[in-house]
Each structure stands twice: as structure tokens, then as C-alpha cells.
């Protein structure tokens, strides 16, 4: 049964509001912070069941709500949560008809590679944005880790701990990126399972065991590793994080 446009966009609005509430749940205390991890689930459900247009509406509403609550979290939500879902939905719903009359959908391996590329692009932009700070991105990351450890321990950290933080700080942005990619995959897969179970899926569920990645992520990884080995400063730190 096809939903009318008004109904579809009403559902999209509800999905956007729910997504914003999940994202803002962290303000309610540490016990609710895990709800933030499924922030993208309502957006994926709307997109995979209703299409790109409703997904855009849901993303815009969710971003607007979070921005009205606090501008900085609103920007973070728009860039880190809503926009990547909209882009993923756009690609996921691409299909073409083969010579035999069968439909071929956008490969899941490319969806995963696109998410990886998006995370890498955000990391590069963050490095450029932090380049004006003392020691660039490295200084910002090291300072943030030190502050967190001081809060957790309730005391100043020693020179040995500071040395270890400085040595391995480049891993931290990459770990955040990996966690973000994992979040995208989990929310997308859960949403596809939900809409498929309800018989509302616009595309068939792909076989995740047959995922084939394109070649370009391997070349990008090799290039960033070389820059990390021979480079230094802000560029070398960002390349190491990649």
C-alpha cells in the first residue's frame, strides 16, 4: 500500500523529531548517552521505507530542532548524523536494469566505502580547522585526552602518562572515525531489517557476506601511511589518524 505524500512527510517529521530527541538525550545524564548511538536509526527508517525526499525532510527537521536547543550540537548533528544518512539513502536507492531485465542495486561495498570517505573528509576538514591552534590537531587532541584523564582520576597526570598520550594521540581521531562508521553500518542494517520486516523496504536487503569494497580505499590508506611516515606537524598527524 502506497502512502500519500502528506502521510509520508508527517512520518518523516516524526522520525526527525525522534532522531533529535535521541541525540539530545545525552543532556539528560550519562545513563542516557547510549541512546545517542541510535540517533540515525529513525532517519534511516524513514529513508529506506519512504525514499530520499522524506529522508531529507526528517534530517532537516532533526537538525533544526537540535540547532534551536544549542547551535554547536546542531551543526555537529547536521554534519555528523543527518547529512551522511541522506547521502547514504540517495546512493542506496540507486538501481539500474540489466540486459536480462534484472534490477541491480547500488553495491553495499560502495556504501561502506562512501561512509569511510566521508569520515576521512571530516577528519581532514577538522585538521584544517584546528591548524591555527597550538600544535594543530595534535595539540587539541592531546589536550582533550589529558583533560578527560584528569577529570576521571581527579588529579594531575604524570610525565610518563603525558608521554604516552603524545605518542599515541594520533590513533584517537581514527578510533572515533571507526566508531562513527560502525554506528552508520549498525543503524543502517537495523533500519533495513525493520522496514523489511514490515514489508516497507524500497530495496532488497543485500547479502553482507558478499560485500566487495572498491580499490580506492586501499590506495588512500597507502597514501596516508606514506604521508604519516615522511610528514610532520599537523599534516603528518592527520595522515596518521587516517
Predicted regions and their residues:
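Short helix-perturbing small/polar motifs within transmembrane alpha-helices
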Residues: 11, 15, 78-130
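Membrane-interface interhelical loops and short interface/amphipathic helices
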Residues: 108-109, 120-171
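Small-residue-rich helix-loop
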Residues: 198-242
Amino acid at each position: 500500500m502506497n502512502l500519500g505524500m502528506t502521510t509520508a512527510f508527517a512520518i518523516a517529521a516524526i522520525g526527525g523529531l525522534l532522531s533529535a530527541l535521541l541525540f539530545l538525550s545525552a543532556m539528560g545524564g550519562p545513563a542516557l548517552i547510549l541512546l545517542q548511538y541510535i540517533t540515525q536509526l529513525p532517519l534511516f527508517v524513514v529513508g529506506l521505507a519512504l525514499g530520499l525526499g522524506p529522508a531529507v525532510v526528517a534530517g532537516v527537521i532533526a537538525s533544526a530542532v537540535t540547532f534551536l536547543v544549542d547551535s554547536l550540537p546542531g551543526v555537529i548533528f547536521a554534519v555528523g548524523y543527518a547529512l551522511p544518512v541522506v547521502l547514504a539513502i540517495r546512493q542506496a536507492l540507486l538501481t539500474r536494469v540489466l540486459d536480462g531485465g534484472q534490477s541491480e542495486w547500488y553495491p553495499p561495498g560502495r556504501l561502506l566505502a562512501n561512509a569511510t570517505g566521508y569520515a576521512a573528509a571530516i577528519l581532514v576538514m577538522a585538521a584544517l580547522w584546528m591548524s591555527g591552534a597550538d600544535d594543530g590537531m595534535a595539540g587539541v587532541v592531546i589536550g582533550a585526552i589529558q583533560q578527560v584523564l584528569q577529570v576521571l582520576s581527579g588529579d594531575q597526570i604524570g610525565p610518563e602518562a603525558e608521554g604516552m598520550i603524545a605518542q599515541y594521540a594520533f590513533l584517537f581521531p581514527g578510533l572515533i572515525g571507526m566508531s562513527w562508521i560502525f554506528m552508520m553500518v549498525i543503524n543502517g542494517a537495523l533500519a533495513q531489517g525493520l522496514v523489511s520486516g514490515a514489508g516497507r523496504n524500497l530495496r532488497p536487503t543485500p547479502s553482507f557476506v558478499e560485500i566487495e569494497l572498491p580499490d580506492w580505499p586501499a590506495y588512500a590508506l597507502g597514501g596516508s601511511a606514506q604521508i604519516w611516515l615522511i610528514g610532520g606537524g599537523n599534516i603528518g598527524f592527520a595522515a596518521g589518524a587516517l
